[in-house]
Amino acid sequence: MARFLIVEARFYDHLNDMLVAGARAALEAEGHEAEVLTVPGALEVPGAIAMAAENGEFDGFVAIGVVIRGETYHFEIVAGESARGILALTMDGIAIGNGILTTENEEQALERADPARKDKGGEAAKAAIALLKLQDRFGA
């Protein structure tokens, strides 16, 4: 059994609830433990994961959040920089599944967040589990 930290950027409560439920269900189905940490926004997710990874309390991480395109350039910054930060941590050997949705509208986000539909929270958790298995295989 491994311990995972689900780090959620809580902005759209109903969508986040679905993403977290999907991630938690996928982790528990494999016999893993899950804890949830909430941060203000998607840009804070990589930093929170980096801090949590320092103490070795968790074996892997699931990044959760929803970024919906608005009328300004802010969407591109948040979507790109949060993904870049997560990728950089993954390249450093931290097992992270990225479940931060970047969509054009709320309907697309709902389709992807709902565990009964596309279940992107569950997919992100499964990705984190897969990366943790690779860590074990390669002794990282």
From Swiss-Prot:
Main function: Catalyzes the formation of 6,7-dimethyl-8-ribityllumazine by condensation of 5-amino-6-(D-ribitylamino)uracil with 3,4-dihydroxy-2-butanone 4-phosphate. This is the penultimate step in the biosynthesis of riboflavin.
Stated family: Belongs to the DMRL synthase family.
Biological process, per Gene Ontology: riboflavin biosynthetic process
Catalysed reactions, semicolon-separated: (2S)-2-hydroxy-3-oxobutyl phosphate + 5-amino-6-(D-ribitylamino)uracil = 6,7-dimethyl-8-(1-D-ribityl)lumazine + phosphate + 2 H2O + H(+)
Active site per UniProt: H74
Protein name per its UniProtKB record: 6,7-dimethyl-8-ribityllumazine synthase
Domain of life: Bacteria
Gene Ontology CC terms: cytosol; riboflavin synthase complex
InterPro entries in alphabetical order: LS, LS/RS, LS/RS_sf
EC number: 2.5.1.78
Residues annotated to bind 5-amino-6-(D-ribitylamino)uracil: F11, A42, L43, E44, V66, V67, I68, N98
Record key words, sorted: Riboflavin biosynthesis, Transferase
Positions of (2S)-2-hydroxy-3-oxobutyl phosphate binding: E71, T72, R112
Alphabetical list of NCBIfam families matching this protein: lumazine-synth
GO molecular function per UniProt: 6,7-dimethyl-8-ribityllumazine synthase activity
Pfam family, one: DMRL_synthase
Pathway: Cofactor biosynthesis; riboflavin biosynthesis; riboflavin from 2-hydroxy-3-oxobutyl phosphate and 5-amino-6-(D-ribitylamino)uracil: step 1/2
